[in-house]
Structure formats: structure tokens, C-alpha cells
Amino acid sequence: MEKFQSYLGLDRSHYFLYPLIFQEYIYVLAHDHGLNGSILLENAGYDNKSSLLIVKRLIIRMYQQNHLILSVNDSKQTPFWGHNKNFYSQVMSEVSSTIMEIPLSLRLISSLERKGVVKSDNLRSIHSIFSFLEDNFSHLNYVLDILIPYPAHLEILVQALRYWIKDASSLHLLRFFLYECHNRDSLITSNSKKACSSFSKRNHRLFCFLYTSYLCEYESGFLFLRNQSSHLRSTSSGALIERIYFYGKIEHLAEVFAGAFQANFWLFKDSFMHYVRYQGKSILASKGTFLLMNKWKYYFVNFWKSSFYLWSHPGGIYINQLSNHSLDFLGYRSSVRLKPSMVRGQMLENTFLIDNAIKKFDSLVPIMPLVGSLAKSKFCNALGHPIGKAIWTDLSDSDIIERFGRIYRKLSHYHSGSSKKKGLYRVKYILRLSCARTLARKHKSTVRAFLKRFGSQLLEEFFTEEEQVFPLTFPRVSSISRRLSRRRIWYLDIVCINDLVNHE
């Protein structure tokens, strides 16, 4: 991104982004850095040569229009989009998100260099969250389960960008584009939630950018108040700031919130507080009392109401005691348990035993939701009995085995941090027998006759990487190999969650 800074001249233009939408190279940049690929190349009927002509035609059409706002009120006749309204709309969605990401990406790079933060991809790993929880949650008492309210109005998403994008023309264009898409979706369905879901699917990159900016706006205020109310810096703030893209916002909030909350900081003093966000939800854990957590609960409700005009009922935030509560998120069921231990001591001629219980953060595989996901994907029925995958019978035998094996290896790889892996044996059984039933159905045979004919060696693809590596590493010490294969392993290369794991 640095090589585009001098070419775009953003420093000299004070982040005036609106003229960039008329430049052809911006569309090339959107194509090269697209998260979901380029709509220019995915659109049927357009090849690589004609895609540049489409861009030029779109730019010329935007130059010729001077009544963009009027087209919003007329849903049946929109001269700006023309006949290919949906296609041009998706092109503008990709380009708009790319343009608005440029100054924020440059701000992130400069902030990292100024703070001396070494950017690491390991911070993006999902498993890094669990390793952090293991180190910090075992000595905490209470946890807030927070459902982050969804912005009910598109204007809230636009307002979240005002502090970062100073170009009013770009914000007006974004506002016009959002209302144009929203009005079109509202004509299709009267349900606002379905209309918003339709918009997020068709404009995934732009929607993710706007939703992330909204979350960062909310978290910046919370992070400022949390750091001001504590004598010790939160150990999670480094990873939190690395995940979100805005730093200067904290300096602005210092001026806004200093007068409003200065007299109430003593209410929130807590040196042991940690925050984790995932899938539109968040967790706030603390060593404080129930009264302190209840104050934080109502702070969040009032903060969303005053800053984002969002009405959130206090019932959407739950206060739970960690010793009696399990956290179900990201495919794991985590809890703080007391691990009993016994210490044998001796004083002179007297020997005595001391019982000592140690708090330990434990993560397990919730097997029933995982079996439910397999049943939803037609690998088994609701009771967990394996069934064949009929739609895969047209594939070759090797492709069928490779698909089933890849699914199990990914599940085993993701759940390698579980302290008890017995639940994965049931998943392995379901997938192996489902694979055998699929192959038997393809060859018009029974499972017993098929396995007797080809042998069980046909399903060796179901061995995981750990099952293959450990016997090679310790070929003579089988007990060490089995013990290591049962140990918890967190991988820092997992940056996305599997659909079968995501039970939310």
C-alpha cells in the first residue's frame, strides 16, 4: 500500500478521495486487492479485454450525470445506473470500499511505525484468542456476555467514518450509494432485516468495511475509558489495537469523554479486565465484584444509546460467574475449573498431605452442536447415524475420499486445542462411515461388501497430520507418541472458522 501513497498524493490533497473514483487505475487496484475477486471478471458475458471498456463507460456516464440525488427518489427510473444497474452497483461497491480503505491503511502503517509495533499475522489467528484466555482468565471472577447491537439505520454506518474521512463529497457519494441499494432491496422485501442481509451478501466487502468501522468506533470509546480507569495497562490492548485499524480516534475521545466521565472513573477501577470480541458478540471478564460488572453493564447500554442512538435492553448483557459458567464461542466450550492436586510434605518424622485446588482454564469440543452441523450438511441424521452423500456419487472414488478426509483433517486441526479429544472420535466415525456409504451407493453395493472387496486401507486419508507425524518422530517410544497426540496444540495459522464449526 505504501507504493500508492505518492502516486495518489493523499497527503497533498488532505484525503480528498472523491476524484479517485474517476481514475481507471483505482478500478485495477480494486480488482487486484479484491476480497471476493473482481465483479468485472465474474460477470457472465464480459472477458478481460472488455472489462476495461466497461470501466471507461461507467466513468463517462458518471461524468455526464449531475442529478445523482434525484435518482434515489425514483426507484423505477435511474438514469445513473442504466440498464446494467445491478452490475454497475457491484462495481461501485468494490471501488468505494477500496478507496476508503486507502487512507485508513496508510494511517495504520504510520501508527505501527510510530509505536514500534511489529505487525504479526499470528495476531489474526483464532487460536491466539484461546491461548490468551488460558493465560489471563483463570484468576478472574465474573464475565459479561455482550450482544453488540446492530446499527438500525444506514446513517450510523456513515457517521462512523466522519472522523477518518475528511472528504465530504466521498461521504455524500457513499450515503447516496447505500440508500440506492437499500431502496432497491426494500422494494423486493418489506422486512428491513432481510433487506440488510441482502445488501451485505451482494456488497460483502463494503458492508464488512462499514461494520468494522462501526465496531472500531464503539471499541475506541470503551478502550479509552478502560485505560483511563486503570493503573495497569490491559494485556489485551496490544492485540486489540492490532486487530482494529484506528489509533487517532483515542486522542479525539480524550477531549470528548474527559469532562463527561472524569467524576465517575473511580466506579470502574479494575486492574484485571480483559475484552474479546467475536462474531458480533463480545466478552468482558474482570476480577471485580458483581456490583462492578453491573455498573459496566449499564454503562454499555447508555453508551450505545448516547453515542450511536441504539436502544439495547440490559437483558441482552448477561453477568456470569466464571466458576459456574461455560463460554460457548468459536467452536469451543471453555470454562474455568478447579483442578485438584495433592502435595506431600514431611516435617521431621511427620508426613502429611495437603489438598490444593488450582484454577485452570479448560477448552472442550461441544460434540452435540458439531454433530448437529454434520446433520445439517447431510453427513448424518439428527441422531448422529451416518448417511451417504448422494450428491457426491458422480465424483471419482479418490475425489470422494479426499473430500471426506479433508473435512475431518480441518475439523481435527481446528479442535486440536481441546483437552479431551474423545468427541472427535465420534466425528471421525460419522465421516468414515458416511464416506463408505457414499462409495457403496456409487458402486451399487452394501457397505460390508464394499469394504470386504476393497479393504479398509481405502480410507487411510482420515489419519490426521498429528497421527502421521508423531509416530515418525518417536518410532520406538509409542507411549510418548500417544501422549503427545493427546496434548493440546494451538495453531497460529488458523485465520478463519470452518462452516461446520460455526454453530452461531
Curated annotation (Swiss-Prot):
Keyword tRNA processing attached: yes
Keywords in alphabetical order: Chloroplast, mRNA processing, Plastid, RNA-binding, tRNA processing
GO biological process: mRNA processing; RNA splicing; tRNA processing
Main subcellular localisation: plastid
Localisation: Plastid, Chloroplast
A Pfam family the protein falls into: MatK_N
GO terms under cellular component: chloroplast
Lineage: superkingdom: Eukaryota
GO function term, MF aspect, one: RNA binding
Protein task: Usually encoded in the trnK tRNA gene intron. Probably assists in splicing its own and other chloroplast group II introns.
PANTHER family listed in its UniProt record: MATURASE K
Family: Belongs to the intron maturase 2 family. MatK subfamily.
Protein name, per record: Maturase K
Source organism (scientific name): Wollastonia biflora (Beach sunflower)
